[in-house]
Curated annotation (Swiss-Prot):
Zinc finger boundaries on the chain: C2H2-type: 507-529, 535-557, 567-590, 776-799
Cellular component terms per the entry's GO annotation: cytosol; nucleoplasm; nucleus
Cell compartment(s), UniProt: Nucleus
Protein name: Zinc finger protein 438
Organism: Homo sapiens (Human)
Tissue: Ubiquitous.
Length: 828
């Protein structure tokens, strides 16, 4: 009886297929532009669903729909039959027969193995994608853009309207429990339609899980009398000749019809364009009007990634088989997808029942798909951020370049402080645009082009890498304009993947690895390694490594804004504006030390301390360069008081109180030719004397190149006990008295007997000045001459001296010895 009854509905179903197709195509007219995308994935889906699951006890015509369903779901152990509803002619119901063993279990591992081989390694599991993790198993068979999908969708309600005659079937109570939720759900949201569809699909996967989700009210799985009415309502949406069979209330019929139409639109739209499934399900259903928050967009992107991954899984599961049967499969697979999307919304016992059914269908792949779902959800969120940040960075790249250049000009302080503020401002700007300018649709075309999990994983990892690089690009590294003293590594191109950093002309020192922005800074820095001082002061000849140091020196010591007393060197006529510089010049160049006396009142003019005894003359070199700086400091500290300068020879430690006397000493003792006419009106520091002595400065400078070495001299206490007579002989000119010999009349003898005999007889006249600041004294005729050469010429022509130079040496020697002898007697 079943065969005879089932044949007419089959014919009717085949005849009514075009009408159902027309109805579904009307719903697809709004989405017709996506119809060209689906055929790209058709071959993989068609080959993956050809499973020989025909029931042996049913005819091919009657089992066409159920067999296709069993192929789609992989339920080879379940057989179906069309039963006529009692008391209703022309109304049939699809009845599930007892489980029969088939070759399907053999195909299960074959379906799961290739999918497991292509699953990516899960890396990140966001907490809010717990629901999405249960959605992934449903997306195994999502996409097959076949042309007969609408017909298959309408053929299922046609074959299923008959009420069941076997209430003892296993999965009958579940659809019955879930039917009220279908009637109670609102009719305007596609999410509700998915929920209702999922209720039936989750609880009766062995029966007709694929078609039931698409047309939930049309699934005849309960024995209650309300099922025929619900089934008639479903048939009303697909077929016109079932309208008279409706027995339920009008509002529920209208609601169920709206739900069915929305589900059909979503199904066909996802069949034709898998990338729009997330938009059809999520954007239309859950997003309210007005501003769109971030979480809905992240979920939508997650759904899109799920769809793409499911396509790859279908490609992995593809098996050879005829394409004619696969043309009717795509719409049924979408029902299975819609059924599992609401798995998390079901009660606990229902979810457990659903998990049991799914484990019977494909147990090994469920866990892997869950992991992949979590991975894809996290990747979709990060990829969404990656799509937004580059646009903003490209928009602000010009401003950032100008900002960096300005900061490099401002200086070190602002370069270190302002970049952080700019980075915070930039982050705030990006965050603002991220919340108000989401563009999830722009992500869909790029993700839809992926064909395998490997490529998806690679792109996903690339997105993570770009996200990390973009985060790093906002750090202070991108402000790489360090200053001279910065020890950071040499800047490189921080921005990759299309973002190139601003190259800066950095120069590195190969010795200490320091970096400098300007080449001139590097040159000045290299002078510190070579001890080269190319910048010297033209006034005091002090040299520096950097030009800035020389500028500072000129401002401090030789600047015109400061009122200074310019000091001229007595030997080389150089001008100095600072007392320390002048003293340093005398020590280094002319070997003359300037010091002070302990106290002006303690010593009388006749008791002025002398520096050195003639007995220790041979030890000149051992005491030359010590304590010079200390004496300078004493002079500077006490220069406010009335002190007497002591000009000491740095070689023999002889002290004088005028530069003229020390010049004569250098000329006589050390043989330094200092040309200059020292007249009575001249004084230390006079310009005439300085100009005459300029030419003698260079040889002395070359003979003594060492600089800055301190010289040691006797302290003031030692000076008080050393040679007071020599000091008196050299400094009697300060009192304005020139001691000359009273015994006139030159004698033919030498000056030595005259000195020796005059000394004991006249102790007050035993001392005389052979030379003074006023000139040279002739001991023979008491004539004053201005220069030594004049004195020697005078001796030669006036006094007929054969060797004036020898006479000068003898007089100089006797004079020194006589002074020493007289001083010893005076002390007694």
């Amino acid at each position: 009886m079943q065969n005879s009854v089932s044949v007419p509905p089959k014919d009717e179903g085949e005849s009514n297929i075009p009408s159902g197709t027309i109805q579904s195509r009307k719903g697809l007219q709004n989405k017709s532009q996506f119809r060209t995308i689906a055929p790209k994935i058709v071959p993989k889906v068609l080959t993956s669903r050809m499973l020989p699951c025909h029931s042996p006890s049913r005819s091919d015509q009657v089992n066409l729909g159920p067999s296709i369903n069993s192929k789609l779901l992989g339920m080879s152990t379940q057989n179906y039959a069309l039963m006529q509803v009692a008391g209703q002619e022309g109304t049939f119901s699809l009845v599930a027969l007892p489980h029969v063993a088939s070759a399907q279990p053999i195909q299960k591992p074959r379906m799961s193995l290739p999918e497991n081989l292509k699953l990516p390694i899960p890396r990140y599991q966001p907490p809010r994608n717990s629901k999405a993790s249960r959605k992934k198993p449903i997306l195994i068979f999502p996409k097959s853009g076949c042309s007969k999908a609408p017909a298959q969708t309408q053929m299922c309600p046609q074959m299923s309207p008959s009420p069941p005659h076997h209430p003892e079937l296993l999965y009958k109570p579940s659809p019955f429990e879930e039917v009220p939720s279908l009637e109670q759900a609102p009719a305007s949201i596609s999410t509700a339609a998915l929920t209702n569809g999922s209720d039936h699909g989750d609880l009766r996967p062995p029966v007709t899980n694929t078609h039931g989700s698409l047309n939930p009210p049309a699934t005849p799985a309960s024995s209650t009398p309300e099922e025929p009415a619900k089934q008639d309502l479903t048939a009303l949406s697909g077929k016109a000749h079932f309208v008279s069979k409706i027995t339920s209330s009008k509002p529920s019929a209208v609601a169920s019809e709206k739900f069915k139409e929305q589900v059909d639109l979503a199904k066909t739209m996802t069949n034709l364009s898998p990338t729009i499934l997330g938009n059809a399900v999520q954007l239309i259903s859950s997003v309210p009007k007005g501003k769109l928050p971030i979480p809905p967009y992240s979920r939508m992107k997650t759904m899109e990634v799920y769809k793409i991954k499911s396509d790859a899984n279908i490609a992995g599961f593809s098996l050879p088989g005829p394409k004619a049967d696969c043309d009717k499969i795509p719409s049924t697979t979408e029902g299975f997808n819609a059924a599992t999307k609401v798995a998390s919304r079901l009660p606990v016992p229902q979810v457990s029942q659903q998990s049991a059914c799914e484990s019977a269908f494909c147990p090994p792949t469920k866990l892997d798909l869950n992991h992949k779902t979590k991975l894809n959800s996290g990747a979709a969120k990060r990829k969404g951020r990656k799509r937004k940040v580059p646009d903003e960075i490209l928009a602000f790249q010009g401003k950032r370049r100008k900002y960096i250049i300005n900061k490099c000009r401002d200086g070190k302080e602002r370069v270190k402080n302002d970049p952080q503020e700019f980075r915070d401002q930039k982050l705030g700007t990006l965050k603002k645009y991220r919340s108000i300018m989401p563009k999830p649709i722009m992500v869909i075309p790029t993700l839809a082009s992926l064909a395998s999990p490997t490529t998806l994983q690679s792109q996903m990892l690339g997105g993570l890498g770009q996200d990390v690089l973009l985060n790093n690009s906002l750090t202070p590294k991108y402000l790489g304009c360090k200053q001279d003293n910065s020890s950071s590594p040499k800047p490189s191109s921080v921005f990759r993947n299309g973002f190139s950093g601003i190259k800066k002309p950095w120069h590195r020192c190969h010795v200490c690895n320091h970096h400098f922005q300007f080449k001139q800074h590097l040159r000045d820095h290299m002078n510190t390694h070579t001890n080269r001082r190319p910048y010297s002061c033209r006034i005091c000849r002090k040299s520096y490594v950097r030009p800035g140091s020389l500028s500072t020196h000129m401002k401090l010591h030789h600047g015109e804004n400061r009122l200074k007393k310019l000091m001229c060197c007595e030997f080389c006529a150089k001008v100095f504006g600072h007392i320390r510089v002048y003293f340093g010049h005398l020590k280094e160049v002319h070997r003359v030390v300037i010091s002070t006396e302990p106290a002006p009142s303690e010593l009388q003019p006749g008791d002025i301390p002398k520096n050195r005894d003639m007995s220790v003359r041979g030890m000149e070199g051992s005491l030359e360069r010590e304590n010079k700086s200390n004496l300078e400091e004493d002079f500077l500290l006490n220069q406010a008081d009335e002190v007497k300068l002591q000009i000491k020879c740095g070689r023999c430690q002889i002290t004088a109180q005028s530069f003229a006397e020390i010049k004569f000493h250098l000329l006589d003792v050390h043989g330094e030719e200092i040309e200059g006419r020292l007249q009575e009106g001249t004084f230390p520091g006079s310009k005439g004397t300085q100009e005459e002595l300029v030419q003698h400065a260079s040889p002395d400078w070359k003979r003594h190149p060492e600089r800055g070495k301190p010289e040691k001299v006797h302290s003031s206490s030692e000076e008080s006990h050393a040679c007071p007579r020599l000091k008196r002989q050299l400094h009697l000119h300060q009192n304005g008295v020139e001691m000359l010999m009273e015994n006139e009349g030159p004698q033919s003898g030498t000056n030595k007997p005259r000195e020796t005999c005059q000394g004991p007889e006249c102790p007050g006249l035993h001392t005389f000045l052979l030379w003074s600041h006023s000139g040279f004294n002739c001991l023979l005729c008491a004539e004053m001459l201005g220069r030594k050469e004049d004195l020697l010429h005078h001796w030669k022509h006036q006094h007929n001296c054969e060797d004036p130079s020898k006479l000068w040496a003898i007089l100089n020697t006797v004079s020194n010895q006589g002074v020493i002898e007289l001083s010893s007697e005076a002390e007694k």
